[in-house]
A protein has these predicted regions:
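M16 family metallopeptidases and their MPP-like homologs
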Residues: 1-9, 21-30, 35-64, 82-90, ...
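Non-catalytic, conformational "gating/processing" segments within enzyme and secreted inhibitor domains
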Residues: 41, 68-105, 301
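A short, acidic, amphipathic alpha-helical segment used as a generic capping/interface helix at domain edges
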Residues: 70, 285-292
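Short, surface-exposed beta-strand/loop micro-motifs that present aromatic residues
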Residues: 73-77, 127-135, 293-295
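Extracytoplasmic/secreted cell-surface and envelope-processing proteins
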Residues: 95-99, 195-197, 214, 314-316
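Glycine-centered hinge/linker elements that transmit conformational signals in sensory
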Residues: 101-115
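His/Glu-based metal-binding/catalytic segments typifying zinc-dependent metallopeptidases
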Residues: 114-171, 175
Length: 317
């Protein structure tokens, strides 16, 4: 806690460390155009956030424009005022010992002025495609399919999104990786984040690293897998997922990290993701999954597709 106090009340200037950090980042970014993974991630971020500089991978010339004094000024604006901070204490501690330390090092941090407001970073909507070709030494194509929606944040939404992504992942692994032998990796995930407007930004993402020769053959399975999961989710997969989540919940509940996350969601987002979690998981059936995907995820019509087609790099280039 003493370190927290010092970091928030006594930000000091260290030009040598700052210069070393910038040099390290510049070195990592210097050859990003030759790194297929960085090229793809930059294209993906630029597509999702429509080229917004706040979201894309920086370039070396961006670092040349960094003003260290301005960085410190921004740091002081954000970290020397505790009004916008919530501190969580989780674990096996003695309250009588902890409270005086909180009073000394946390309660004494200045708390004044207005809270910072979230900055809106627009996200691409509608049907968006970014398909490009990249030559590389070891050709590997990459595909990302994102379905995006805004919806109220609830425990039910969180559970349905998680289970839906797991069902898609099992379908993609079974068909794209095992059946077609087309993928080095194929999977799906759900992302849930409270956006600047207070609504849940929900995205369901399917992705794969593919053998370039099987890209065209594998691509339709991202959509057929989604269609199947809507119309008739695999009952065996669904039961297995529910059992895994129920078992994992009891394991997670014994960890500090779990309770920190639960408290954070409750205080910041106003959502209790613990009390009825197991009951909510147990109640999920195929119809609930289909209705969720059709009426929540797909209804807005937001679909982003980013494909990097890979070709063999010519020798000497």
């Amino acid at each position: 806690m003493q370190l927290i106090y010092l970091k928030m009340t006594a930000l000091s200037k260290d030009e040598k460390s700052a210069a070393n950090l910038l040099s390290t980042i510049k070195t990592a970014l210097a050859n990003q155009s030759k790194n297929p993974e960085m090229v793809y991630q930059d294209s993906l971020q630029s597509t999702i956030y429509m080229g917004n500089k706040m979201a894309r991978i920086p370039k070396t010339e961006d670092l040349d424009a960094v003003n260290y004094d301005r960085v410190l000024e921004l740091g002081k604006q954000m970290f020397t005022n505790a009004k916008d901070f919530t501190f969580f204490f989780v674990g096996n501690y003695d309250e009588a010992t902890l409270l005086p330390l909180i009073e000394q090092y946390i309660a004494s941090i200045p708390s004044k002025g207005a809270k910072l407001k979230n900055k809106a970073i627009p996200v691409a909507t509608g049907e968006v495609k970014n398909i490009f070709t990249k030559s590389m030494e070891n050709p590997m194509s990459q595909v990302t399919e994102i379905w995006y929606a805004k919806t109220p944040y609830t425990l039910q939404t969180s559970v349905l999104a998680d289970i839906s992504a797991r069902l898609l992942q099992m379908d993609y692994l079974r068909n794209i990786r095992e059946k077609l032998s087309a993928a080095y990796h194929a999977g799906a995930e759900a992302s849930m984040e409270l956006d600047w407007d207070g609504q849940l930004a929900l995205s369901l993402t399917g992705s794969a690293q593919l053998n370039p020769e099987k890209l065209d053959e594998a691509l339709p399975y991202f959509f057929s897998g989604l269609k199947t999961t809507i119309e008739q989710p695999n009952a065996s997969d669904l039961q297995k997922i529910k059992e895994i989540l129920t078992k994992q919940a009891s394991v997670d509940a014994k960890t500090n990290g779990y309770w920190t996350g639960i408290l954070r969601n409750y205080v910041i987002n106003g959502i209790d993701l613990h009390t009825d979690y197991v009951k909510t998981v147990s109640s999920v059936d195929g119809k609930a999954i289909g209705d969720f995907l059709k009426n929540i995820v797909l209804k807005p019509g937001n679909h982003l597709e980013v494909i990097m087609k890979a070709t063999k790099e010519e020798a000497g280039k």
